Amino acid sequence: MKIAIAGASGRMGRMLIEAVLNDSDAQLVGALDRAGSPFLGQDAGAFLGKETGVKLTDDLDAVFAQADYLIDFTRPEGTIAHVAAALRHDVKLVIGTTGFTAEQKAELQAAAARIGIVFAANMSVGVNVTLKLLEFAAKHFSHGYDIEIIEAHHRHKVDAPSGTALMMGEAVAGALGRSLEDCAVYGRHGVTGERDPSTIGFAAVRGGDIVGDHTVLFAGIGERIEITHKSSSRVSYAQGALRAVRFLSARGAGLFDMQDVLGLR
């Protein structure tokens, strides 16, 4: 599997590079970084003390010409540029970027008519199994329980609520036959009045080096149920991304997510 990594100098990019180098079925053929990065020209394995022969570059076409797959955990504007290059070079994409607008998501959907794309806000096996647990719980706590989603991440995260929190909200709302867009409440401040029982609330915490904590609270009278997932390392995301690459190796064009990859549908 000839794999290139986007955002190669970042925390997630380095974790992905390490995962690819440690996988006997995978070959690192490219490492993209943003224009102006001080790491351009550096060997992709330097942070591991390894010489890979792959240099960090901002030349999209040079990287895509070598790759069969790109793994991208960057930012929406960067990912959209990578999608255009992937279409030019017929490269399949594994996308873990979050914070897309509706218009940008539509661009991913359109691109998937020509290339295979796995797009998931969270690629850990644990989170995706948790989504199934939430669907089950929501169906059984549909009356008399208020639903709140609380997430916490490191101080450097730029979007809120997290993509994973939104995935959880969509799983719960879908199980209840609702649209998350219509029932979500993002944060509360001041005199808000009594809680609307049809809503799903979101709260975001940012601080320190928290990798990612998510709790969905079903609060009833006399009891509450909490379903929580906590990430202690980004390695679970990297392993999930490689699993997604293997999934795409046997697929043609189409837009998939980790539920497809893990056979949870």
From Swiss-Prot:
Gene3D superfamilies: Dihydrodipicolinate Reductase, domain 2 (3.30.360.10), NAD(P)-binding Rossmann-like Domain (3.40.50.720)
Catalytic activity: (S)-2,3,4,5-tetrahydrodipicolinate + NAD(+) + H2O = (2S,4S)-4-hydroxy-2,3,4,5-tetrahydrodipicolinate + NADH + H(+); (S)-2,3,4,5-tetrahydrodipicolinate + NADP(+) + H2O = (2S,4S)-4-hydroxy-2,3,4,5-tetrahydrodipicolinate + NADPH + H(+)
Binding of (S)-2,3,4,5-tetrahydrodipicolinate, residues: 154, 163-164
Protein's UniProt keywords contain Iron: no
GO terms under biological process: diaminopimelate biosynthetic process; lysine biosynthetic process via diaminopimelate
Stored InterPro entries: DapB_C (IPR022663), DapB_N (IPR000846), DapB_N_CS (IPR022664), DHDPR_bac (IPR023940), NAD(P)-bd_dom_sf (IPR036291)
UniProt keywords, alphabetically: Amino-acid biosynthesis, Cytoplasm, Diaminopimelate biosynthesis, Lysine biosynthesis, NAD, NADP, Oxidoreductase
GO cellular component: cytosol
Binding, NADP(+): 34
Chain residues that bind NAD(+): 7-12, 33, 96-98, 120-123
Pfam families: DapB_C, DapB_N
HAMAP family: DapB (MF_00102)
Function as written in the Swiss-Prot or TrEMBL entry: Catalyzes the conversion of 4-hydroxy-tetrahydrodipicolinate (HTPA) to tetrahydrodipicolinate.
Family recorded in the similarity comment: Belongs to the DapB family.
Name under which the protein is recorded: 4-hydroxy-tetrahydrodipicolinate reductase
Organism, scientific name: Burkholderia ambifaria (strain MC40-6)
